[in-house]
Amino acid sequence: MTDEDELVAAVKADEGEKVRAIHERNPFLLRMPTPEGTLVLTAVYHGSNNALKALLDRTPEDALNLYEASATGNPRRLKTILGQSRARVNDPNPEGFTPLGLAAFFGRPEAVRVLLDHGADVNQKPPSRFANTALDAAVAGDHLEVVRILAEAGGDVNVRSERNYTSLHKAAAHGNADMVRLLLDHGADPNATRDGGNTPLDDAREKGHAAIVDLLKTRGANE
């Protein structure tokens, strides 16, 4: 196995010590490209927190790109990047994810605020396979604070993603009462139907979330 392959495997397996060892013998590999874009993004996507720490400890902050800074939640680096005229805050990466979508999905509230302050489109639907906005991505990631920030910034709580799911469908299926309440408070439709005909109440019931079913009923959901 080459050092390149071994390093990618170590990142995916969250083997921080192995990442450090490979870096010692070949430090230039840390900025090698990967299918996800960079090793930092590979670590974030796979939830490899130990590997991510090893990578960030060995990566100069000014080497992080827009997508890495968004996904890892580095507001200081974001401010520097976005202060440069060449930065394009709404441009998706090769996988179709925007900086705001990455910060939202991975629960980086400070990064979300910086991106919004620099003109990120809160309702942009990038060409990713999930076809979701940043708010919907934050709901999928179960990040209540980020959803609140985006909703207060004008995020559409009734936008549709793949198979016509709304954010309320996802929150109801997750069983997150606070998220359901927040979405309803911002105008989410409790009777929206997705492909297959299910409403959020139907999805909550199928997942066994009785408290969510009761909550939705009190907020206008039909049986």
Annotate the PLM regions.
Residues 23-28, 54-60, 82-88, 113-121, ...:
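Ankyrin repeat domain, specifically the short helix-to-loop turn at the C-terminus of the second helix
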Residues 1-9, 53-68, 153, 186, ...:
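Ankyrin-repeat-protein effector appendages
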Residues 2-7, 32-40, 62-68, 92-98, ...:
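Ankyrin-repeat boundary/"N-cap" motif
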Residues 2-32, 73-92:
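N-terminal segments that cap or nucleate solenoid repeat domains
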Residues 125, 132-141, 145-148, 152, ...:
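Alpha-helical adaptor scaffolds
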Residues 158-206:
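Ankyrin-repeat and related helical/solenoid repeat scaffolds used for protein-protein interactions
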Residues 9-14, 42-48, 68-74, 102-108, ...:
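Ankyrin repeat A-helix N-terminal signature
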Residues 18, 50-51, 77, 110-111, ...:
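Conserved ankyrin/ankyrin-like repeat signature
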